[in-house]
Amino acid sequence: MKDTFEKHETGYQTNHWNRGIEYRKGKSIERVEKPTKLHRARTLGYKAKQGYVVVRARIRKGGMHKVRPKRGRKPRAMGVSKYTTGKNLQWVAEERVQRKYPNLEVLNSYKVYADGRNWYYEVIMVDKNHPVIKSDPKINWICEPQHTRRVTRGLSASGKKARGLNKKGWGSEKTRPSLGANKGRGK
């Protein structure tokens, strides 16, 4: 299944090319009927059953777009260039989708497309109040209260990666229990 989806088409008027045109015309956060990359969605926990929702998010590429101050100062004190968010753009996309759909919970996400200006992610969301989700033993952990707004606390896969929690052992002493607990010395 993966080989079918990951086969990169070259040239114009292909499905991949037309998909990009459709994404650019659409809204920045848009619900989709089914996942574009089915193999990736299933790996991350998606099932074709009630209670699962897939949302596509568009987010601009690059670091923080800081506004240049109008008043005079030394160029190094402008605070414009070389500033980054400290979190990856996939995590930012997940947070924006969570804000748009407050009754759903973010399960995971994956990159689906990129052009010169934007990244496009598909975010898998779960309706934790749906009876099908509550009765499924593989996913009903998300219905418990400690998993509320998990993405805003950096508990999704991209959030944990941005917080440096994929690294273990020597060199990662300051990443746990959190970056804040170690006064930002980690990562």
Model-derived segments and spans:
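Low-complexity, rRNA-contacting terminal tracts
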Residues: M1-Q50, G72-K187
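Residues forming anionic-ligand binding surfaces in small-molecule and nucleic-acid pockets
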Residues: P69
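An N-terminal amphipathic alpha-helical segment
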Residues: K49-K66
